Amino acid sequence: MRRQGWDGPAILVTLFLCTASSPVAAAEPPPETIAKGKALTEAGDCGSCHTADPAKPFAGGKRIATPFGGIYSANLTPDRNTGLGLWSDEDFRRAMRFGVRPDGANYYPAFPYPHFTKLTRDDILAIRAYLATLSPVANTQPAPELRWPLNYRVLMRLWNFAFFRPGIFEPDQNKSAEWNRGGYLVEGLAHCGACHTPKNFLGADKQSARFAGSVVDGWFAPRLDGAMRGGLKSWSVEDIAEYLGSGRNGHSHADGPMAQVVLNSTSHMSDADVHAIAVYLKEIQPSAPEAAATAPSPTQMADGEKLYKGACIACHELDGSGAPRIYPPLPGNTNLQSENPASAIRIVLDGAETITTPRAPNTGSMPPYASKMSDQEVADVVTYVRNAWGNAAPAVTAAEVAKARK
């Protein structure tokens, strides 16, 4: 649940390119606060973007690609020279709530402060307390590689004026406590919209198309609203919770950046929080209509069917039913029926391996076909699975596949 616009790979960037400020308070937080902060840090998927070297977790240095150039994630360890070791609690709160560095400069919105602004002060400081327990690692990040004039941070003040609305999440008194907890996570800490909401030409969320899906690192982060084919209309609350907790359900499997989100974040969440997210997502109504799917040509469907029967039926079966929670079913698959075919193309080209989580330890894999199929053949077989068995989605072209190979 990665980003387009300012938001880079993985569902999820906390960018602290900072200078030192006032010293950290010496008081040791209680163990329960640190444990809470660890859980919140996992829910925010901070490690995915702030870990370039697995041997140096949270030390930053990972390059985040944006349409405007590269940005490097910062060091969240308590190193005093290159990390957060000299930050005060107030420095950390201002960064999370307002996107402002200790020296007063603005962060770029690749760091999802437009979402983190919704967190309570207690939760922000619990995250801070947990990060302070990490082993300090000296690791200086390269400067951002943004093109002129975006390399001037002062311009972010204009961006904030136009698009940023700070403020803690306000519960809806007409909704249940569970729905409000889900909203707090979806809209705030988990920052789902950072990947699943399309962006405008300046990298800000298109509010007229909230959760309508967006391209992230060559994959399509699908709709999270109630759209019939490409959204969650056919998923129950339990389906959504199972997917977030395990990376799979009876409808689909997590692949690409979303697989990392499940591995590093949602699979670590409590059952209660996963269920709360599912309750909230299930009530999101489509903000933008699904595009009508024109039936592909009979020739392309016939060619795609031949390829499918030759390469796919051993695992996915002739009727596309697959194997429960090992090889995903293809009929009714929302990822397949997304208006944008990027994810389906990527899986055929690169193959896939089902992630394993404590809730779903068994695995399955699919070989890559990039070297075995031409661009047209990939387009044909993807078009076929997107339109067979009652599915409906736009046809895929060889040009789209060629672009995905680059």
Feature names for model-found ranges:
Residues 1-7:
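N-terminal secretory signal peptides that target proteins for export/translocation
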Residues 9-20:
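Bacterial N-terminal signal peptides
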Residues 23-27:
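Boundary at the C-terminal end of the N-terminal hydrophobic targeting segment
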Residues 31-32, 43, 51-70, 102-183, ...:
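Flexible coil segments in periplasmic/lumen-exposed cytochrome c-class electron-transfer proteins
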Residues 84-100, 104, 126, 233-237:
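Aromatic- and charge-enriched surface segment that lines or borders ligand/interaction sites
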Residues 305-343:
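C-terminal structural cap/anchor segments
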Residues 337-342, 352-360:
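C-terminal lobe and pocket-closing loops
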